[in-house]
UniProtKB/Swiss-Prot annotation:
This is DNA-binding protein HRL53. Keywords: DNA condensation, DNA-binding. It comes from Rhizobium leguminosarum. GO terms for molecular function: DNA binding; structural constituent of chromatin. CDD domains: HU.
Length: 91
């Protein structure tokens, strides 16, 4: 499912116009992104948690040349599914 399909599904499920649903979906994405950028967590009971995980700097290799490459430290978004979501997918 891509973003347009998600907007259509939200519009149908919630009885909204596609424009209103697109605004709602964009708002959710913006809030999640802003919270994670500020290193916050978003915990949605029964659905899952969005968190930020820190990856330490490490050494890598260029597969073509074999030269050693420094890979800088960075923060990466992480999603951990909740029990309700796991049960829904497996049930």
């Amino acid at each position: 499912m891509n973003k347009n399909e998600l907007v259509s599904a939200v519009a149908e499920k919630a009885g909204l116009t596609k424009s209103d649903a697109a605004s709602a979906v964009d708002a959710v994405f913006d809030v999640v992104q802003a919270e994670l950028k500020n290193k916050g967590d978003i915990r949605l009971a029964g659905f899952g948690s969005f968190t930020v995980s820190h990856r330490a700097a490490t050494k890598g290799r260029n597969p073509s040349t074999g030269a050693e490459v420094d890979i800088p430290a960075r923060n990466v978004p992480k999603f951990t599914p909740g029990k309700g979501l796991k049960d829904a997918v497996n049930g």
